[in-house]
C-alpha cells in the first residue's frame, strides 16, 4: 500500500511540473493560449484515468474490490490457502507380491497355483513311486531296478521249472530227482549206498566199492572152491 501511494505522489508531481511548464510557455505566446489550456486539461484527465485504473487493478488483485470482494472472501478456505492446488494423491500401484513374503516365495507359490489350475505336475514332484503304483503301470510286476531282490515264490511264478539257479544254487535231493528221473546228480551225491548200486547193476554191487567178498560169495561165483589168492 505504501509503495502504491508513493508511486501516485510521484506521478502527480511530474504532472504538475509539466502543467506549470506549459503555463509559462503560454504566457510567452498569447496566440496559443487556448490550445495550451485544452492541452493541460486533456493531460490531467488522461493521467487521472490511468491512475484510477491502476489503483482499481491493485485493489482487485488484493481481494478488496467492491464488486467481487464478497464472492472472493466467501470462496476462501479456512486456512487462507484457496489458491493452492489440492495435495497430490498417493498413486496406488499394482501389488506385485505381498510384503510378508519374499519374491522367491511368491514365485514358488505362483507356480504351484498355476500347476494346480492347469493340471500340470513337475517331474521332481513324482519321481518316487510306490510299489503299488508300479504294479498298476506294469502288469508283469514291479520294476526290477527298484526291486532287485525277488523271493523264491516270485521266481517260481516267473519260471515254471523252478527258481533261478543263480539265486538258489544249492538244490535238495528231492528237487534233483524231479529234474533227473534216474536219480540225483552224482556230483552232489557221490557216495551211494549198496542198495542203490544193486538197483543200478543187477549182478550186484560194484567190486571197486566192495573188494573184500565173503567165502560164501566166492563159492557161488566159483563152484570148484574159493580163490587161493584171497584165502
From Swiss-Prot:
Residues 1-21 form the signal peptide. Residues 21-83 are annotated as: Required for secretion from the host cytoplasm to the host apoplasm. Glycans are attached at residue 32. Residues 116-231 are annotated as: Disordered. It comes from the Eukaryota. Mimics host plant CLE extracellular signal peptides that regulate cell fate. May play a role in the differentiation or division of feeding cells (syncytia) induced in plant roots during infection. This is CLAVATA3/ESR (CLE)-related protein 4B-2. The gene is CLE-4B-2.
